[in-house]
């Protein structure tokens, strides 16, 4: 702090500002530095909290879907986010080979969340993209069809999809 004061006083003197005026400028700058930085950040943070709370209250499904699509965030796990959404009345549907896309989406007019392929551990966005792309040509009619049309899909990927329940609706296969 002493060195910063000396630099500030020296800079002021180079501009013709000396004595009590230079001291007063330094004192005010230091006071603002101790207050202004945290104050501005707390205002920004308060605004984000307010906006987030408003969205979560009025659009809980959209709020949760957006947080799921922003993973990894480092604050809450996807499981925690889904559990909280359900506790607030949001219906959350699992991954479905026939309808899911890469990320979480809204269904039924925005009141329901459909989990995306990125919620399947170990699947990866490239493989998820391939699944969606192949499904646009035609629906998968079996696991063999999925394996044939999506190069690079492994037994581990199939097991992860099965564990997530992705084959239940589309192929009639349960976990």
Q: Whereabouts are the PLM-identified features?
A:
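Noncatalytic, beta-rich nucleic-acid-contacting surfaces in large DNA/RNA-processing enzymes
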Residues: 3-6, 10-175
């Amino acid at each position: 702090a002493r060195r910063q004061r000396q630099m500030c006083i020296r800079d002021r003197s180079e501009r013709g500002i000396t004595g009590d005026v230079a001291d007063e400028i330094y004192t005010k700058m230091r006071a603002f530095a101790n207050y202004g930085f945290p104050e501005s950040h707390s205002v920004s943070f308060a605004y984000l909290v307010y906006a987030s709370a408003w969205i979560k209250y009025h659009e809980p499904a959209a709020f949760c879907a957006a947080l799921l699509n922003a993973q990894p965030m480092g604050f809450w796990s996807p499981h925690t986010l889904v559990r909280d959404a359900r506790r607030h009345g949001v219906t959350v549907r699992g991954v479905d080979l026939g309808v899911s896309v890469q990320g979480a989406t809204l269904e039924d007019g925005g009141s329901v969340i459909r989990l995306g392929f990125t919620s399947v551990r170990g699947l990866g966005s490239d493989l998820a993209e391939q699944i969606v792309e192949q499904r646009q040509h035609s629906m998968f009619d079996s696991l063999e069809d999925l394996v044939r049309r999506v190069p690079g899909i492994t037994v581990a990927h199939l097991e992860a999809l099965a564990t997530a329940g992705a084959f239940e609706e589309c192929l009639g296969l349960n976990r």
